[in-house]
Amino acid sequence: MIQEGKLEQQFFDYLHSERNYSVNTSTAYENDLLDFRRFLNEQAITTYQQVTFLDVRIYLTELKQKSFSRTTVARKISSLRSFYTFLLRENVINENPFTYVSHAKNQLRLPKFFYSEEMEALFQVVYEDNETLTLRDRVLLEVLYGTGIRVSECAGILLPDLDTSYQAILIRGKGNKERYVPFGVYAEDAITDYLPERANLMSRYKKSHDALLVNHYGDPLTTRGIRYCLSKIISKASLTRKIHPHMLRHTFATDLLNNGADMRTVQELLGHASLSSTQIYTHVTKEHLKSTYMKHHPRA
């Protein structure tokens, strides 16, 4: 049973001190979280980390059945999304189950992904030279797109986690669950080219650790550091639309499904505890099929 505790109080303190929310707004957030906690207890969900996208959909259905106004539902979703964004920031969770629920219409919001032309532009950036940090960025991009792992998981890769004989990486994911994720020849070649340069860089700065990815001083690259590196790659590629690093994970899943991979396999590769978290990508592939049909069929 979930009871109000430290996490909620930290969130409410955050609303007051950092967001400068009024007392009335903060009270509304508290009531929304209280109602959601009641729902979770009824569903025998004992931690906020266990909540999946499917649980969110069930909760939305319940709100609809109770005839809440669209405005009220939108506010509740906004409150809970903010709470889960806070949990994400505090590294309590790895994914926000409210991400794909829109504010106004409570409709499914499809994950954004890179188109093939955009991926080509990104790879051109990391293959433009063989400088140490460019080689590092090449590994970063090849591994993230080639495995679909989260940015935080990528930051945690250690050299002993690499099994080159089986072309697989040991990943420590959500809830410290471990899984092996395969990687392809492009990622393998990128890692092979990078490791000697990594060793030289670490020797120059007298560093000693097992982190695969390092910064310009030879220290382990953090999650924030990876996001910064990816942002620089994206900027150099001159991509114009609003994008974020997590889209590489979305692109990995979407490309697999578009090319015939089964849902269960994609679920395992992504490290999703529930199949419902993976099913969001079937909507993306349907949109892809429709757009392809509309573009190429003479009677569309």
From Swiss-Prot:
> What NCBIfam families has UniProt attached to this entry?
PRK00283.1, recomb_XerC
User: Does the keyword tRNA processing feature in the UniProt annotation?
Assistant: no
The job of this chain, per UniProt, is described as: Site-specific tyrosine recombinase, which acts by catalyzing the cutting and rejoining of the recombining DNA molecules. The XerC-XerD complex is essential to convert dimers of the bacterial chromosome into monomers to permit their segregation at cell division. It also contributes to the segregational stability of plasmids.
Give a single Pfam family match: Phage_int_SAM_1
Q: Name it.
A: Tyrosine recombinase XerC
One GO MF annotation is:
DNA binding
| SUPFAM superfamilies noted in UniProt | DNA breaking-rejoining enzymes
What do the Gene Ontology cellular component annotations say? cytoplasm
Catalytic residue list: R150, K174, H246, R249, H272, Y281
Q: Where is the signal peptide?
A: none
**Superkingdom:** Bacteria
Q: Where is the Tyr recombinase domain?
A: 109-294
